[in-house]
Amino acid sequence: MMPPLSESLGIKTSIGGGWMYSSAKKLKESNTSLELAIATIYPESQLIVKEIEGVKYYVLPLNGKKNTKYNKHLENYWKIVHEDFKPDLVHIHGTEYPHGLAYVKALPNSKVVVSIQGLVSICARYYNNGITFKEILQNITLYDVIKGNLLQGKKSFVKRGVYERDLLTRVEHVIGRTSWDYAHVKAINPPINYHFCNETLRKEFYQHQWSYDTCEKHTLFLTQAGYPLKGFLQILKALPFIINRYPDTKIYVAGANIISDKTWKDKLKRTGYAKLIKRFIKKYKLSQYIIFTGPLDEKNMCLYYLKSNIFVCPSSIENSSNSLGEAQLLGVPCIASFVGGAADMIPTEACGILYRFEEVEMLAEAICTLFEKSQNFDNTEMRKISALRHDADKNQARLNDIYNNILQDF
């Protein structure tokens, strides 16, 4: 939900998705006569329509149903929204949730383009990478029994992937940004028209520059650790090798402390994955090296990038990580697993180090190498390449061209 809408409804603004708000603002600024509407979903039962700062907002109700399951009743709401706003073009951001599919099924003749963020149908293959079946069974918790364990988490990705593929076979135009998403989209729907356009990131990350002199030496920063796909366990597996050489190493992890047991509520809500992580940390006596920062807004996220010695993206799969893009834009030394579209974001050694996801020893070596060399790290080329990739004006001009080309095509 966009910040102006959240504030108007008295709802806490979401930390994620800030890049989308930046993109919407840029779209309005570059097209002063544009009529823009933004639609989203929420758990309640009433359709909300609001106009704020020249933008019309529609909030479609899920009536208490999960956003991961297909809700046929959304089709009628989409028809209401379409009739009220009468859009020339509809841009669906992301394929991960089925409310976009509901729009396309309700209005099959509408002019639509879909942006690829991640591809859940592909990510499902790698959901539990690095974790054995035995480890999953050994760490099932009460919360898993009620809400679903790691196996069911993967199953949910698979089910959502069915909706995703359905959506991609129904549309004629898609926007992507990596060789990875291009290959997979074309495999799903060969005739689809693929339009390349890079992402514009959040404003704060264009305004600062990392420096070795002001960073906290021998620290790592991870922006996510909540579920297996993000690769936190791989960092923990690499950590014993790292602290043998750099015993003062610290890992800052953005987000809630998934292993906290301070309250009964923490214990009750602990997932099997969190239990596995906690056991691993205890077994290898790693707790002193790990600091969960709590949820971070844009400014505080930026501060942690700047204070850290290295940014690591250890995911088992990514399309193009916005976190990696933010780190590169700031000039933080970067390491990423060689998965998905990571190679497109790290085309040269100046932009970072790539390693194979499974090779935790290689990850450890990459970290130790950067610890040693970061005093003389020259981030000029990385920042230049990243600034070109995430150039807000250039990306907005490209998006405008895509919109115009699609409208002419229909």
Where are these regions (language model features)?
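Short alpha-helical donor nucleotide-sugar binding micro-motif in glycosyltransferases
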Residues: H82, P295, L303-S308
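Conserved donor-binding/catalytic core segment of Leloir-type glycosyltransferases
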Residues: S211-K230, L236-F241, I251-A254
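Nucleotide-activated donor-binding/catalytic signature segment of Leloir-type glycosyltransferases, i.e.
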Residues: K265-P295, K299
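Short hydrophobic beta-strand element within catalytic cores of glycosyltransferases
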Residues: P333-A336
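Conserved acidic donor-binding segment of nucleotide-sugar-dependent glycosyltransferases
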Residues: T348-E349, I353-V360, T369-Q375
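A charged, aromatic-enriched C-terminal amphipathic alpha-helix characteristic of glycosyltransferases
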Residues: Q375-F410
